[in-house]
Amino acid sequence: MASLAAVSVKPVAIKGLAGSSISGRKLAVARPSARSIRRPRAAAVVAKYGDKSVYFDLDDIGNTTGQWDLYGSDAPSPYNPLQSKFFETFAAPFTKRGLLLKFLLLGGGSLLAYVSASASPDLLPIKKGPQEPPQPGPRGKI
């Protein structure tokens, strides 16, 4: 800590920045030391996976690549064919983002129009007007 306190920063003139302070003083910039400039070290990347850095095990393909028998299946769909046809037909347009966005905008706009058309017009206080007669203040004024 004591060695850090002894280091002082001397003002250095930087071309083009000398008049940047309001009082016209030069900016104080610490000169880079030889220690702070380091070249990047070339080192091999080492990643450890499992025991003895084994990345791919030909003897245990199931744990290396995943359980394809559990998730990948060539069996036909267990759902009703009519149900599958319905979802393939009517959900196909919504697989595209643009069509889904248009559907949501039209649905939201129509909902907003319906709610605003069916709203009661006298909800705002300015439309209702005063509900009670005004009470006079402390000096008898309204």
UniProtKB/Swiss-Prot annotation:
Coiled coil: none annotated. It is a single-pass membrane protein. Residues 122-142 are annotated as: Disordered. The chain crosses the membrane at residues 99-119. One of its GO terms (cellular component) is chloroplast thylakoid membrane. Residues 131-142 have a biased composition (Pro residues). Its main location: plastid. Keywords: Chloroplast, Membrane, Photosynthesis, Photosystem I, Plastid, Thylakoid, Transit peptide, Transmembrane, Transmembrane helix. Residues 1-48 form a transit peptide. GO terms for biological process: photosynthesis. It is found in: Plastid, Chloroplast thylakoid membrane. InterPro entries: PSI_PsaH. Belongs to the psaH family. Possible role could be the docking of the LHC I antenna complex to the core complex. This is Photosystem I reaction center subunit VI, chloroplastic. It comes from Zea mays. The lineage of its organism: Eukaryota, Viridiplantae, Streptophyta, Embryophyta, Tracheophyta. The gene is PSAH.
